[in-house]
Amino acid sequence: MKVQASVKKICGSCKVIRRNGVIRVICSAEPRHKQRQG
């Protein structure tokens, strides 16, 4: 999981979601694409 100031989709499978006020990117195709804004 990368913690970034700015999160963006890296591939077509990435989804931007909001959990408990934190913006996250989850990706089923490539788990290395997981990101969290912080």
Curated annotation (Swiss-Prot):
GO terms for cellular component: cytoplasm; ribonucleoprotein complex; ribosome. Transmembrane segments: none annotated. Pfam families: Ribosomal_L36. Signal peptide: none annotated. GO terms for biological process: translation. The keyword Ribosomal protein applies. GO terms for molecular function: structural constituent of ribosome. InterPro entries: Ribosomal_bL36 (IPR000473), Ribosomal_bL36_sp (IPR035977). Keywords: Ribonucleoprotein, Ribosomal protein. The keyword Cytoplasm does not apply. Belongs to the bacterial ribosomal protein bL36 family. This is Large ribosomal subunit protein bL36. It comes from Acinetobacter baumannii (strain AB0057). The gene is rpmJ.
